[in-house]
Amino acid sequence: MSDAPHKTLHQILDPDGWKPARGYANGVAASGRTLYLGGTIGWNGQQEFESDDFIAQTRQCLQNIVDVLAVGGAGPEHLVRLTWYITDRDEYLARLKEMGAVYREVIGNHYPAMAMVQVMALMESRAKVEIEATAVLP
């Protein structure tokens, strides 16, 4: 295992000889109190969409995660896993730079283990992104 270039409260798992992951971790080892967040979409606390824009929904979705973490006494630095579900791979790829900026704005320079999955649709018809999160407090 080698140390990844980003700082984290948990141990980043990168096998020797592997090219470092960019924007995520290959694996994370953590122990402590675990918080499991259900699928979070890009609507506000009143369950209303303020935008149909992919980036705006992503920002709101990430902020929703931060808000739920705070209730559990955690912050973005405690995240160990994010699973993203998106409805449009092409839009994601075309707007990757904006996605990165929004991620860093809300979450910071913390990159847990992540997976990104394209789905045909999400349960809320206006939703373009949904994220499940797991966090561990030491």
Model-found features: residue ranges?
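N-terminal presequence-like segments and the immediate start of the first folded domain
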Residues: 1-80, 86-138
